[in-house]
Swiss-Prot record:
GO cellular component: cytoplasm
Ligand binding (substrate): H366, T367, S368, G369, H370
Residue ranges crossing the lipid bilayer per the database entry: none
Cited Gene3D superfamilies: 3.10.20.580, Metallo-hydrolase/oxidoreductase, Ribonuclease Z/Hydroxyacylglutathione hydrolase-like
Protein name: Ribonuclease J 1
Keywords for the protein's UniProt record, in alphabetical order: Cytoplasm, Endonuclease, Exonuclease, Hydrolase, Metal-binding, mRNA processing, Nuclease, RNA-binding, rRNA processing, Zinc
Main EC class the enzyme belongs to: hydrolase
Binding, Zn(2+) 1: H76, H78, H144, D166
Keyword DNA-binding carried by entry: no
Organism, as annotated: Streptococcus pyogenes serotype M3 (strain ATCC BAA-595 / MGAS315)
Co-factor binding comment: Binds up to 2 Zn(2+) ions per subunit. It is not clear if Zn(2+) or Mg(2+) is physiologically important.
HAMAP family: RNase_J_bact
Knockout-associated phenotype: Essential, it cannot be disrupted. Depletion experiments show it is involved in, and may be rate-limiting for decay of Class I mRNAs (they decay rapidly in exponential phase, are difficult to detect in stationary phase). May be required for initiation of decay of Class II mRNAs (more abundant in stationary than exponential phase, show biphasic decay kinetics).
InterPro entries hit by this protein: Metallo-B-lactamas, RibonucZ/Hydroxyglut_hydro, RMMBL, RNase_J, RNase_J_2, RNase_J_b_CASP, RNase_J_bac, RNase_J_C
Amino acid sequence: MTNISLKPNEVGVFAIGGLGEIGKNTYGIEYQDEIIIVDAGIKFPEDDLLGIDYVIPDYSYIVDNLDRVKALVITHGHEDHIGGIPFLLKQANIPIYAGPLALALIRGKLEEHGLWREATVYEINHNTELTFKNMSVTFFKTTHSIPEPVGIVIHTPQGKIICTGDFKFDFTPVGDPADLQRMAALGEEGVLCLLSDSTNAEIPTFTNSEKVVGQSILKIIEGIHGRIIFASFASNIYRLQQAAEAAVKTGRKIAVFGRSMEKAIVNGIELGYIKVPKGTFIEPSELKNLHASEVLIMCTGSQGESMAALARIANGTHRQVTLQPGDTVIFSSSPIPGNTTSVNKLINTIQEAGVDVIHGKVNNIHTSGHGGQQEQKLMLSLIKPKYFMPVHGEYRMQKIHAGLAMDIGIPKENIFIMENGDVLALTSDSARIAGHFNAQDIYVDGNGIGDIGAAVLRDRRDLSEDGVVLAVATVDFNTQMILAGPDILSRGFIYMRESGDLIRESQRVLFNAIRIALKNKDASIQSVNGAIVNALRPFLYEKTEREPIIIPMVLTPDKH
């Protein structure tokens, strides 16, 4: 449902993902007959979303206004900013503007979905300017944990709207530094509204420099004499480069496992972000010719993904690599929301195999790509927005970020903590909430998109917690007799061989319930099914304090 009242002179600012959550970043700026979309990300599912692969936004508002959508502009190549693009393009073929690395990553995704040939894509950099009828777009360099991050400036008739994308202020970066001079100049020119990254609003200090992490990685690798398995985000090209440099300095060759990691290395080398001597990267088949002290394995799986290379290595199901005594596994990452349990489980599995594990909680081998409070205040001080909208964070993060904005002098009434689907209406001297449109989560489960709802997830949770009970009976509605059963089958509820008394009591309860239901002259399969569920559910809860899913199956005799 859409209920928006934008006046002709107002600029609309909205999000269909990224507010009140980490992930799904998808923002929009609209003015009259033009809409510009910034990013199109996915969110990784929390533990209670059983069987769900990804969560994407509901793209209905974009699809319903497709004739007005002029561009999808990308801040950088992380999954929570580009992962939704294939799902969006299946519904709306929008021109995409992205930097070289982000574009390479997007191409890989679109090729997997068979969408690359039909896609309209343009490469941009921080000097690019895009011009449309009423709006234009320019860019400025920021710093993040992936090359080529940019902030986006959308020039509207009412003023500039700036989306920072993910950022930190790293004064000793591995890649290009952020363009503070450009940010300050924008602030002096005047900025109508800032949409800024809230992820680390709970961190009071500056985040560590990527260079510090590189030094720690080198120091750790220098002290390891066995084989090293190095797991990180495949998209963290800077981290991979620093690990590769450490391998070269310590006389190690590098083998790569995991499709996304292999692609990242290829992209990093082609674009000049990974620079090592020829022969540093080797084929997996060459590992057998090297001593353990000469090997560093880069692999996917730092988030505990069950099918990624590291999990298969740990579980002994990888075809080419198994854990060996003397190995050390380095997790150069931290778990993203929803993955903590699976990461901890994987670490436990590796350590139970007698292999050392080094991870960011214990050692200084990971740093966030998101700025803490001091960096957020610096961004606000440089940009000096009239209005402020904290984005990219859960509500408490947005709330803290809003407080930081007040600390530097932005009036409380000029700060908007919004929800996905809210539309902020702006002019040069006014701001108001102009309405709301539907922006619910859409679940991706295998090839299914949006066909999994709350009822299915509830059933999955019930099955995982309490199992299922199948109650089977054959009845004759003409004679009002039970011909066979009732029989009880169970999966994930009780061990039937050890629960004979409960099974027999359940059968007695069902026999009486079915017998009473059959006495009704209007008895039907549906009514008997209902009687089975209504009798068995409270009985089982009374006996076990568990609520399995109950599936009744009423059969009738063959008339032939």
